[in-house]
């Protein structure tokens, strides 16, 4: 059974609080709109040591692969915050919008949302125009004539590759993530130590 943080020694609580604060500072500017499948707020397990340990493992897992980062709500929020510092958050927001788009089952809603995404991210002088080649741009434009769940696949793939090869390595090397990963390692070790040191109750 998970032990509550309230039962941990003060030093353990302070370490967990410090880690949470550091992550909060790192993410506080990350605001993903509902149209992109909102995942902008980090989730900190404040009640159970197991949740906090899993959270630390989540942070450390972001450096294992880009897929793991994108599959983590906290990872997406952290990566989005980093991209905002580079003024390139539109790539991730477009990718997320495409992921949500694929879940639409109504043909009418699909067509309407397809045009919204195109106007926001693809068309010339779009407010959040992504950097894709002319061929992909034209292919996507043609796909909108008969919108399907896959009409943005080519453009989404291009932006994903760009993020994975360009932005993702810089994110991992950023002082913010390296410091966060160090804190995650320390927090994980501390929580493990506290769990072992906590007196048993009978």
From Swiss-Prot:
Under the heading CDD domains, the entry gives: RGS_RGS16
InterPro entries assigned to the protein according to its UniProt record, in alphabetical order: RGS, RGS_sf, RGS_subdom1/3, RGS_subdomain_2
User: In the record, which residues receive a covalent lipid, type S-palmitoyl cysteine?
Assistant: 2, 12
Q: Does the keyword Transferase apply?
A: no
**Entry's PROSITE patterns?**
RGS (PS50132)
Q: Residues where Phosphotyrosine occurs? A: 168, 177
Q: Where in the cell is it found?
A: Membrane
What Gene3D superfamilies does the record tag this protein with? 1.10.196.10, Regulator of G-protein Signalling 4, domain 2
Membrane topology per record:
Lipid-anchor
Q: Which GO terms describe its molecular function?
A: calmodulin binding; GTPase activator activity; GTPase activity
Q: What tissue expression does the UniProt record report for this protein?
A: Abundantly expressed in retina with lower levels of expression in most other tissues.
* The protein's assembly and partners: Interacts with GNAI1 and GNAQ. Interacts with GNAI2, GNAI3 and GNAO1.
Protein name as catalogued = Regulator of G-protein signaling 16
Gene source species:
Homo sapiens
Q: Which gene encodes it?
A: RGS16
